[in-house]
């Protein structure tokens, strides 16, 4: 009965979604997986099939994916844990589901532990599947989220290892794929197992201050509500509390107590666009309405409406002085922007069909990752660190002389910019002009800089370049050339000796 109830809940989630109704296909995948895992129990004592059902529910309800992903989630452990093969899956469910299940089977296991290098290679495979089908990595993140939610039944040593791995790679990946709420939950769950005392301390503080926060929010929201209603807007306004992990991070990095963190809660306004009015303009209309009521802090305006983040995130952020004399951050988003902020890449697909546009920054990021993965560098652990560098950094926006915008990680140099244009330009780069001023290759860039790259045919990548480039692409390209040169020198000296 427990199994049937779990599956019925999954079907209900699916029928509430916007996807085409393919209930028979999902039922067939469930029956196949249920029979394949029959009699097997999880460590918690419940039937094993409850895990694939839970992963499929995350994929459907929290990521907004359709029947292909739901079926693949239901079948994701069949090839690894039972006698069935990828060919059996292909015969029963077709090429696409077989390809996704195959991708998920290849990347089972962790990335830390005795076989760290082999497991890092696993992760390399995982990221390579992103360029073939992003759904592989989305289902892998859903699988990890369910394992984290049920980590309590594991031995403490295993809990610690899985939590560390989640914080190191899966949370940053979820962030980069725009899965904001999943990223936050993965961080908080990892933190709970890695630092239980600190987790309990901050959770207790949040609970103790909840009532006063709610009163502050009501006081703050009343005049804003009145103003927005008078403008005829359909919207919802709610308070969003910072996660336990991000509060702890701020306490650690700033060296402050819980009581000294002023932005523990933010206000989010999500509106349904008025017909015929541009979404961006409506964001700024709401901004105007709020700044008529409260004093703004000009250095805290963040316009991700005109220039979305690389993971697709769009919103207008501002910070104002609330009625109680505390600074309050406000995030203004349309319903579409909110969907993309919460469901990330999955929601991108939904909206991309209707808006034909060039590749998003995320598509470009996936392309960069693919280039790095395909470079013949044998050291998979170095590669993991390189990827990690580029997963969690903030972005800056830099202009070419023709006015094209390039997105780079914070701290990127003129040489990183040259490699972002093309690897040949990077290899031949001798310097740059930033805002018409001559600078060295190591010059760090800032948002809004205009950069012109200077090249020379006789230039070759130098080993010291690795000391100051920050992007994974630049590092991989420089490494590849230096290795090739070392091999050629080695061969030449062998020939001389002969």
Enumerate the predicted regions with their spans.
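Alpha-helical phosphate/pyrophosphate-handling elements in metalloenzyme active cores
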Residues: 28, 40-74, 78-88
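Short, contiguous pre-domain boundary segments
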Residues: 1-19
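Structural motif
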Residues: 19-24, 46-49, 62-65, 129-136, ...
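Short, well-structured alpha-helical segments
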Residues: 23-34, 49, 70, 98-105, ...
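Active-site flanking loop/helix segments enriched in acidic
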Residues: 17, 29-58, 108-126, 402
């Amino acid at each position: 009965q427990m199994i049937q109830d779990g599956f019925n809940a999954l079907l209900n989630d699916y029928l509430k979604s916007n996807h085409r109704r393919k209930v028979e296909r999902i039922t067939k995948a469930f029956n196949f997986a249920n029979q394949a895992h029959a009699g097997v129990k999880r460590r918690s004592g419940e039937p094993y099939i409850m895990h694939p059902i839970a992963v499929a529910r995350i994929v459907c309800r929290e990521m907004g994916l359709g029947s292909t992903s739901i079926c693949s989630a239901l079948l994701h452990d069949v090839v690894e844990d039972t006698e069935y093969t990828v060919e059996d899956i292909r015969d029963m469910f077709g090429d696409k589901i077989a390809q996704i299940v195959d991708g998920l089977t290849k990347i089972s296991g962790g990335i830390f532990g005795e076989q760290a290098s082999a497991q890092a290679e696993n992760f390399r495979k995982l990221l390579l599947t992103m360029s073939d089908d992003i759904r592989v990595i989305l289902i892998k993140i859903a699988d990890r989220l369910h394992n984290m939610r049920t980590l309590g039944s594991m031995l403490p040593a295993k809990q610690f290892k899985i939590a560390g791995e989640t914080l190191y790679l899966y949370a940053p990946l979820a962030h980069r794929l725009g899965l904001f709420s999943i990223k936050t939950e993965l961080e908080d769950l990892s933190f709970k197992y890695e630092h239980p005392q600190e987790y309990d301390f901050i959770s207790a503080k949040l609970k103790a201050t909840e009532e006063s926060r709610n009163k502050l929010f009501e006081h703050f929201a009343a005049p804003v509500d009145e103003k927005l209603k008078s403008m005829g807007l359909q919207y919802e306004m709610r308070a969003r509390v910072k996660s336990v992990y991000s509060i702890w991070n701020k306490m650690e990095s700033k060296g402050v107590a819980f009581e000294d963190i002023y932005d523990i809660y933010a206000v989010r306004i999500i509106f349904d666009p008025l017909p015929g009015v541009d979404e961006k303009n409506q964001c700024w209309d709401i901004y105007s309405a709020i700044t008529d009521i409260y004093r703004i802090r000009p250095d805290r305006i963040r316009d991700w409406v005109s220039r979305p983040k690389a993971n697709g995130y769009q919103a207008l952020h501002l910070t104002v002085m609330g009625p109680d004399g505390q600074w309050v951050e406000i995030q203004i988003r349309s319903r579409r922007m909110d969907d993309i902020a919460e469901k990330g890449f999955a929601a991108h697909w939904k909206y991309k069909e209707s808006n034909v546009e060039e590749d998003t920054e995320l598509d470009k990021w996936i392309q960069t990752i693919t280039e790095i993965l395909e470079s013949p560098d044998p050291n998979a652990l170095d590669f993991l660190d390189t990827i990690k560098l580029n997963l969690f950094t903030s972005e800056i926006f830099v202009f070419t002389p023709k006015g094209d915008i390039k997105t780079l990680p914070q701290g990127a140099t003129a040489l990183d910019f040259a490699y972002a244009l093309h690897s040949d330009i990077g290899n031949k780069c001798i310097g740059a002009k930033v805002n018409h001023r001559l600078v060295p290759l190591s010059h760090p860039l800032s948002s809004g800089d205009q950069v012109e790259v200077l090249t020379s045919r006789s230039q070759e990548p130098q080993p010291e370049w690795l000391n100051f480039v920050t992007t994974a692409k630049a590092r991989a390209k420089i490494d590849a050339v230096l290795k090739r040169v070392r091999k050629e020198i080695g061969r030449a000296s062998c020939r001389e000796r002969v």
